[in-house]
């Protein structure tokens, strides 16, 4: 990973289509781009591709120029797609928090606090938390190499708002390190420096800075809406957007999709209730 950054090689990122996946992918992409690396992101279509890495998408990331692909919030059970990439000498790093099998998939590195050989704890972290710790380690190694001698070192604390968002929306226990992440992340959100979160907060008409309830019930559902009935990549591009006007445009699209999702959900519930009542009456 250090070699990829030092040599400014493009990196592929494959993320999950929920908030945890979007925040994780946005963090890695933003960090690498601040270090001078180009990134290519793929978030799968929930209905056409399903959950987790697939060979076609991984090959597409490789064809764009990525010799290294990172999967976030997925990949721990994707044996066949990862094996296919190994056969053509593509390095893969799996960053996940889901429970693995005893046998691990073929990858250059697997970062998962639920590995049976992990004795450092952190089993309650979501992918965003694991990703943040990964970036801390990567940043430390780059510093040792003197990579930041003539360039600005990324401020890792800027990503804690994304860590907090992913942590709350993935409904992991808010204890220990998770609690610290969320507390610090909410403080950073008050500064409104992430244009994506700022735009979502404004569109959600929050009367004050986001709290855990706002993350879980206002911001999170809007980000998830893209993966459920629209473009699954909207969420991650919103969270890494550096242009305030573009961020507002993306947030508006997600808000519209969320309204559509709520309408469809209500309509479906009404149909189901009607069918049940009909069966009972008969």
Predicted regions and their residues:
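Hydrophobic helix-and-loop "lid/oligomerization" segment in the mid-to-C-terminal part
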Residues: 1-68, 87-89, 106, 140-282
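Active-site cavity-forming subdomains of large catalytic enzyme subunits
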Residues: 59-128, 132-144, 148
